[in-house]
């Protein structure tokens, strides 16, 4: 039965995964990657197959099959600036992550998510990546005419906490 969501959060020294069934976590694991494990890879995106294999091993040991998934949600990467929201991972995004302007492990989320999703004909998404840019024009000012502030931070965390607080206060975040 397709009733699970796989969450992927690749970081510089680990890949965190969670599997949810409805709102309940049924598996949570942090796969550690030592410096020695990652040393053979010249570029972050070269780690894709290595991390993919680790994720598949964890899912197998947990008895979770890819064909039980309804979708995958992965940590978003260093794309061009975009508004906040949920985005389906597509070939254009994959190409941008394979040829990034900046390398970071978060770029692997979309790559791994799309690979796994394609294996079982489901969709993969990213949500509020670090490149979300919703700054107002005046917030870009730095005091130097030739220097503009660039928006880049952990939007997903900020918005998740803000939505929780808003719920507690009986308000909406948006």
Model regions: which residues?
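A generic structural motif
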Residues: 22-26, 67-68, 122
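Short glycine-rich, Thr/Ser-proximal phosphate-binding strand/loop in the N-terminal lobe
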Residues: 5-46
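Short beta-strand-loop/turn "lid" adjacent to the catalytic site in phosphate-handling enzymes
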Residues: 59, 64-105, 131-146
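Short glycine-aspartate micro-motif
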Residues: 5-8, 69-73, 174
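Glycine-rich anion/phosphate-binding loops
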Residues: 48-54, 101-109
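Conserved active-site "lid/cap" helical segment
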Residues: 32-73
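Phosphate-binding/catalytic loop of phosphoryl-transfer enzymes
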Residues: 106-110, 114-174
């Amino acid at each position: 039965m397709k009733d699970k969501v796989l969450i992927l959060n690749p970081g510089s020294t680990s890949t965190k995964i969670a599997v949810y069934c409805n709102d309940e976590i049924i598996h949570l694991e942090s796969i550690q990657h030592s410096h020695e494990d990652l040393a053979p890879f010249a570029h972050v995106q070269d780690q894709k197959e290595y991390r993919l294999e680790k994720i598949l091993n964890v899912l197998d040991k947990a008895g979770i099959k890819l064909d039980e998934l309804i979708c995958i949600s992965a940590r978003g990467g260093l794309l061009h600036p975009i508004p906040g929201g949920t985005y389906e991972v597509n070939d254009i995004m994959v190409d941008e992550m394979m040829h990034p302007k900046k390398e970071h492990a978060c770029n692997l989320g979309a790559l791994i998510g799309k690979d796994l999703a394609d294996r079982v004909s489901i969709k993969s998404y990213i949500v509020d990546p670090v490149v979300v840019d919703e700054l107002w024009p005046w917030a870009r000012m730095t005091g130097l005419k030739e220097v503009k502030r660039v928006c880049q931070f952990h939007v997903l965390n900020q918005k998740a906490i803000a939505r929780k607080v808003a719920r507690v206060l009986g308000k909406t975040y948006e």
